[in-house]
């Protein structure tokens, strides 16, 4: 699976918001992740439309989680920002499509078991098969 910049920064911002527990300005989040404010705010807008983030403009404004961190999974974020976890195919070997599809599905199943609350709490995420 190739982790896109949108996914990495979006998930990072959500984890920061979960840990903060209060509104955080977009420029503060962007500075923390070393990315432009405009780029991160575009990602946050997608997360807002999906119902994960709320925002308010002004001196006492910022972004915050619109739902409890325990109700948002990494799979939710992947689907919102990237559509789905798809293993990037580097070759065109015949007969491997089902292998790549199985790996992609296993990735999404694992991501469904991880919540923002778990990640923001600093828990060591270990998956078992």
Regions found by a protein language model. Name each.
Residues 69-94:
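Conserved segment of winged-helix/HTH DNA-binding domains
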Residues 3-36, 64:
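N-terminal helix-turn-helix DNA-binding core of bacterial DNA-binding proteins
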Residues 90-129:
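C-terminal regulatory/oligomerization modules of transcriptional regulators
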Residues 15, 45-46:
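Core alpha-helical elements of the protein kinase catalytic domain
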Residues 31, 48-49:
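Alpha-helical residues within the helix-turn-helix
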Residues 51-66:
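Beta-hairpin "wing" of winged helix-turn-helix
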Residues 49-52, 80:
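Residue cluster at the C-terminal edge of the helix-turn-helix DNA-binding motif
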